[in-house]
Regions:
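Aromatic- and Gly/Pro-enriched helix-to-coil junctions and flexible linker segments
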Residues: 1-601
């Protein structure tokens, strides 16, 4: 089962992501009207760029925070974020089984929270929330959210508590609104889909009197609990004038991105993807918005369950910038929506249908009954959605990608795989095995701003990989190229077959001695520029806990820093730094300094 074919809890509300922005670009504008550019950061190596090294920390902070005309500051719209993700008044809005979803029930109205990690060493409960991390900070397709659990219900009467360290990665980043917010990043019209699967063993407590929770947790054959949520209509809370005034007054207030979230919780089963939606893939040809479909056999009835949350766009951004908890409002009304298989219309839904009009109450999921003839058509033909009206120069034209490729290995840090990694790539045709032998094509490129090949051409992989008729998966070996240990960068590896494609991202850290002789005890003057200066400038919120530019403060906190940069914390929201920007060589150098032990690169 999954969010499409199992019992569901649907929820919606607001969400905030408090990320820090200066590391999103290696350069910043400077001079009158941004007429010049300064190479500020060497992001693959997490260091201040050579061109900026002679500037003082205060000078660089002033340049980062300088107004940048009508678009925030030279360093972007948030310099002081802690990377925390938190839900805002997210409530369960409907529950039930496919074909029988209701806006009333024992859990409707209960709040939903994502949690941070409990301490893996001391077992202390979470003290912070989930953390948003970009594998490549210059990219829009490498976002991750490190999560430590989930809770339904308030602290005084929790209905469900889950504790497990999982990572959600962004999928299906595409246009969700025809028009975004004007005073905002270019991502404001976009949406991103995130999914995690918690094992059943991670359930700490639950209300066993809840029939709905019982149907999920005790679903026959269930192995876990899956949560899929979509973030959209996101923009910084403050406008450009507000942020510039705040910085000018010396307040340096965090300016998180705020927006909408719609999601679904359901039982997970063996063989289903853990971090991406299950089912056949449909794509809106105009916006790139992606949906999923699956045939459900339930209580003697066949249903076509459609995740349509991203398939029909919304016309405009919300009217009130900071209002992220009021009703989201309808998508574009293209007229009656026809769902078809091949050339045959299965059903035409009026635009007043509640699953179209109030889609966010139902997780964006629609269940449509099928008769025997329709079931045969759906199983053997591509699906599509269409509607008659043209709105703002756009029409609704959604088609199924007959081939779908997907993988639970989305964002990988290659230092964790010194011998290489094998991608377990799932391949489907109309939801089933491939009908004929074929050849999967693989191609590497840059996922972000670092387009020179020295920063992304770092992997060994087969250019093509055969798949036989009847197969549903292949295992593809990936490793770092020989002779690249001194290089650092980011690689996007796309895999495609016929009309289907997807990708995985990789971060490769350099192995270096920083020019420090082996056997010597590192000094502050060596460690600060090699390890800490970049983090002090790019992530000043860290210094609100430990001032990263103060030798005494770092030394006094040495035990905590050594602990939190250790591998025991790596998969948690408590890892330092939370953005995973410190290479193994940097961590080793920092530890050598903090423990006064000879440097062994």
């Amino acid at each position: 089962m999954s969010i499409l074919n199992g019992p569901r809890l649907n929820f919606w509300g607001g969400i905030r992501t408090d990320v820090s922005l200066p590391n999103n670009s290696p350069t910043i504008p400077m001079g009158t009207g941004g007429s010049q550019t300064l190479n500020l950061f060497d992001l693959p190596n997490s260091q201040v760029a050579a061109e900026a090294a002679s500037y003082s920390d205060d000078q660089l902070n002033e340049l980062i925070n300088a107004p940048n005309g009508d678009y925030y500051t030279a360093g972007g719209w948030n310099h002081y974020g802690q990377h925390v993700v938190d839900m805002q008044n997210v409530l369960i809005s409907s529950q039930g089984t496919p074909g029988a979803i209701s806006t009333t029930g024992d859990l409707v109205g209960q709040p939903v929270y994502l949690l941070g990690s409990k301490d893996p060493v001391t077992n202390q409960p979470p003290v912070s929330g989930p953390m948003m991390v970009d594998l490549d900070p210059t990219s829009g397709i490498t976002t991750q959210i490190y999560i430590g659990g989930l809770q339904i219900g308030g602290t005084s009467n929790p209905q469900l508590v889950i504790q497990a360290d999982v990572v959600a990665s962004s999928f299906d980043v595409a246009k969700r609104l025809l028009v975004g917010e004007t005073d905002a990043p270019g991502s404001s019209p976009l949406s991103g889909t995130f999914q995690v699967t918690f094992p059943l063993s991670a359930v700490v407590s639950w209300n066993q009197n809840s029939a709905m929770l019982k149907s999920i947790i005790q679903a026959p054959g269930a192995t876990g609990i899956v949560v899929r949520f979509v973030m959209f209509e996101m923009c910084p809370g403050m406008t450009t004038p507000q942020l510039d005034a705040d910085y000018a007054a010396g307040q340096y207030t965090p300016n998180p991105s705020i927006g909408r979230v719609v999601g679904t919780l359901a039982p997970a089963f063996a063989g289903e993807p853990l971090i991406c939606p299950v089912g056949r893939q449909l794509v809106n040809g105009k916006t790139g918005g992606t949906g999923y479909a699956e045939v459900v056999a339930l209580k003697g009835q066949n249903l076509l369950s459609l995740d349509m949350l991203n398939l029909i766009p919304k016309a405009t951004f919300r009217a009130v910038r900071t209002d992220i908890t009021s009703p989201i409002g309808p998508n574009i009304d293209y007229g009656p929506v026809s769902i078809s298989a091949g050339g045959t219309t299965l059903v035409t839904l009026p635009s007043s249908n509640p699953y179209l009009l109030d889609y966010y109450l139902y997780g964006g999921i629609l269940d449509q009954a099928l008769n025997a003839t329709q079931l045969t058509q759906v199983n053997g033909s591509p699906l599509s959605l269409s509607a008659p009206n043209t709105v703002a120069g756009t029409k609704l034209a959604v088609s199924e990608m007959t081939y779908r490729l997907y993988c639970d290995q989305r964002n990988l840090y290659m230092d964790e795989y010194p011998e290489g990694v094998t991608l377990d790539l799932q391949v489907r045709y109309l939801g089933g095995p491939v009908p004929a032998a074929g050849s999967i094509t693989l191609a590497a490129s840059s996922p972000g701003s670092y387009e020179d090949s020295e920063y992304w051409d770092l992997l060994d992989y087969p250019a093509t990989f055969a798949i036989a008729k009847g197969q549903t998966s292949v295992q593809i070996p990936i490793s770092c190229k020989a002779g690249t240990t001194a290089q650092a960068g980011y690689t996007n590896l796309e895999y495609s077959l016929e009309d289907g494609s997807s990708f995985s991202n990789f971060r490769i850290y350099s192995i270096t001695d920083f020019g420090i002789p082996a056997g010597s005890v590192p000094t502050w003057d060596q460690v600060y520029p090699a390890v800490l200066r970049f983090h002090y400038l790019a992530f000043p919120a860290m210094s609100r806990f430990i001032p990263l530019n103060q030798q005494d403060a770092i030394w006094n906190a040495r035990a905590a820093i050594v602990a939190r940069t250790a591998d025991a914390y790596r998969g948690t929201t408590l890892y330092m730094p939370v953005v995973r920007s410190m290479s193994p060589s940097q961590r080793a150098l920092l530890k050598s300094y903090l423990t006064s032990t000879p440097w062994q690169p």
